C-alpha cells in the first residue's frame, strides 16, 4: 500500500484547501412566483411552501426564522 514519503507542511495543506473554497459559488437565488421572496432554485420556498405553482409543504415559523 502506498504511503507518503514526507509529511506535508501546514502551509502547503492550507494553500491546497484555500483554492477549493475560493472556487465555490454561492447558491443560485430566484424570486418565488407566489410570494416574491428569494428562494434557492429547484427547491420549495421556505416562506410560502410553494414549488412550481403547487403547495408542497406547509409553511412553518421554524423554517422562516
UniProtKB/Swiss-Prot annotation:
Any single Pfam family the record assigns to this protein:
Ribosomal_L32p
Its cellular-component GO annotations read: large ribosomal subunit
GO-annotated molecular function? structural constituent of ribosome
Give any single GO term for biological process.
translation
Keywords, alphabetical: Ribonucleoprotein, Ribosomal protein
Ribonucleoprotein is among the record's keywords: yes
Q: Residue spans with biased composition (Basic residues)?
A: 1-18
Hey, what's the signal peptide range on this chain? none
What family does this belong to? Belongs to the bacterial ribosomal protein bL32 family.
**HAMAP family listed in its UniProt record:** Ribosomal_bL32
Entry protein name: Large ribosomal subunit protein bL32
Organism of derivation: Salinibacter ruber (strain DSM 13855 / M31)
Amino acid at each position: 500500500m502506498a504511503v507518503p514519503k514526507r509529511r506535508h507542511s501546514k502551509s502547503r495543506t492550507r494553500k491546497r484547501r484555500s483554492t477549493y473554497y475560493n472556487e465555490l459559488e454561492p447558491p443560485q437565488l430566484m424570486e418565488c412566483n407566489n410570494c416574491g421572496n428569494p428562494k434557492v432554485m429547484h427547491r420549495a420556498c421556505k416562506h410560502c411552501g410553494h414549488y412550481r405553482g403547487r403547495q408542497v409543504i406547509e409553511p412553518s415559523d421554524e423554517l422562516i426564522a
